[in-house]
Amino acid sequence: MAGEKNFENRLKKYLQSVGVYPLGTAKDRMTVTPIGYYEKRWGGGYSKAGLPDMHLVVNGISIDVELKGPGGRPSELQKHNIRQINEGGSIALLLYPEGFETFKELMKGVIECRAHTQELNALKAASTSTGCDTLTG
């Protein structure tokens, strides 16, 4: 679990470096021009089980990320939900530390394209079978 938390903190630091801030961040705390937001989802209570750990909106494009530390395994419900999100036309990823650079490339495409295009769908397809798997089909 510590490995996943460390990876989550690394991801948050990267997101803020490109202008994706925690939802509700005050403008005067933003060090680069904002292009989106993220929110961390917490399990339990009134939350729906199996939702990805983080929800991001970058240039209007929704991205959901299920983080796993080294050796972590997604539940069947998590895999089902990721597939359903992708089949709905959004982007959902199962992200391991070894897939972080692939994730950054996907983010670069989202930031540069500013639209959900064929190129972004190709990036989703290219991520399959890596540490940054989109889990389609």
Where are each of the predicted segments found?
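Catalytic phosphate/metal-binding cores of nucleic-acid and nucleotide-processing enzymes, i.e., regions
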Residues: 1-137
